[in-house]
Regions:
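Long, distal/terminal scaffolding or interaction modules
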Residues: 69-71, 82, 86, 96-99, ...
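Single conserved hydrophobic/aromatic residue that forms the stacking wall/gate
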Residues: 1-9
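Terminal amphipathic helices with adjacent charged low-complexity linkers/tails
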Residues: 101-158
């Protein structure tokens, strides 16, 4: 099977920007991503109306402000964001079953499942070269196709942690 971008098994490949549906997550995984960054869609689920005033401290719905008067306008609830992600997960499960995958990890980097002709033949794709994106590196089955080795962070052995432990 093809490996897509997931051959970099010691690194995380993250998809970010414009993720709104479970289908977006599936496409990212098939291209090799093993992490997914959502930002705008959960903000909308919590009540954001996209006024693009976050940096001005004048958010009219009270999400991105420290002004007590504006903060009182916030009517969002954490449950709305949780429900959004439940719907995403449900759609991902549904599409995985349609594609014949039982585990999410099985899907990472399986670019052969994508219908590439529709993308390549689309009028907006005229003149674009997708060969590098859909390249099959012909790696053996012994080569992992997703991030299965976690990084070793030296932060667990820093002096601060030892001092905090001693202070208890």
């Amino acid at each position: 099977r093809s490996r897509g971008l997931g051959d970099v098994y010691k690194r995380q490949v993250q998809v970010d920007g414009g993720l709104r549906t479970g289908r977006d997550v599936i496409i990212g995984a098939l291209l090799g991503a093993d992490e997914f960054g959502f930002s705008t869609a959960p903000l909308i689920a919590s009540g954001c109306i996209m006024m693009r005033k976050c940096h001005l401290n004048t958010c009219p719905v009270g999400i991105a402000t420290q002004d007590p008067v504006l903060r009182k306008r916030f009517v969002g609830m954490p449950e709305h964001v949780v429900n959004f992600f439940f719907f995403i997960a449900e759609e991902v499960r549904f599409l995985m079953s349609k594609l014949g995958f039982k585990k999410f990890d099985e899907m990472i980097g399986e670019i052969d499942v994508l219908d590439k002709k529709k993308a390549i033949n689309h009028w907006k794709a005229k003149g674009l070269d997708f060969s590098k994106l859909f390249f099959d590196p012909k790696m053996g089955e012994s080569v992992p196709k997703y991030n299965c080795d976690k990084q070793q962070h030296p932060i667990k052995d820093i002096l601060d942690r030892q001092l905090i432990q001693r202070s208890k």
